[in-house]
Design a protein with these regions (language model features):
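Gly/Pro/Ser/Thr-rich low-complexity, intrinsically disordered segments predominantly at protein N-termini
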Residues: 1-190
Length: 190
């Protein structure tokens, strides 16, 4: 059966699907841009990471890995692993907590328990577009580590394009995950 498309009187953008994005990536279409990610069907070029961002991400990864090991949760903290969130998202968060770190291709969405973004110049984007994409997909918990304000925005209970629960934790205070029982991350060294 042929699907009839509505008559458009003006041009409309086309959102890329994850499979379109992967084909373009594999063909080398994004080689000149170093790193990209797909958010709501649009391809975004990712900025270079300066020392404050890189340092915070590195320390947070070490702390998260140690905290996961303590609770023996069969989960792993993966740095900069792209996540398949069909149909229109393939983000590359700073840290992904997943039960399927091994394997080929993108991290399967069903394995994701928590996503962490480290933000300096990207704070507005991470708390708006990325938050909507993660909540819409049903990411159980989302943290945004704000380099400049020295806080972690912790969000959980996704509903539609938002998280219904959130709190702000100052660096130095522990962060208790809501989606992973027993997981508490010390932020004293951040």
């Amino acid at each position: 059966m042929t699907e009839l498309l509505p008559l458009n009187t003006s041009p409309l953008p086309v959102k890329l699907r994850v499979e379109d994005y992967l084909l373009l990536d594999e063909s080398g279409a994004f080689d000149a841009y170093r790193k990209t990610e797909l958010i709501e069907g649009e391809v975004y070029f990712m900025n270079a990471q300066h020392r404050p961002h890189a340092r915070l991400k590195s320390r947070l990864h070490i702390l998260m890995a140690a905290a996961l090991q303590k609770i023996d949760a069969n989960l792993e903290a993966v740095v900069e692993g792209s996540v398949a969130m069909p149909p229109n998202n393939a983000p590359e968060p700073d840290i992904v907590i997943t039960s399927e770190a091994e394997g080929d291709g993108l991290i399967p969405f069903a394995s994701v328990r928590l996503i962490i973004e480290v933000s300096d110049s990207t704070l507005a984007f991470d708390l708006d577009e990325k938050l909507k994409a993660y909540a819409s997909a049903g990411v159980p918990e989302y943290w945004v580590a704000d380099v400049n304000a020295k806080v972690i925005h912790q969000m959980w209970a996704p509903e539609g394009e938002a998280y219904t629960e959130r709190r702000e934790i100052t660096f130095g205070e522990p962060v208790d995950a809501t989606s992973i029982e027993g997981l508490s991350v010390s932020t004293a060294s951040l």
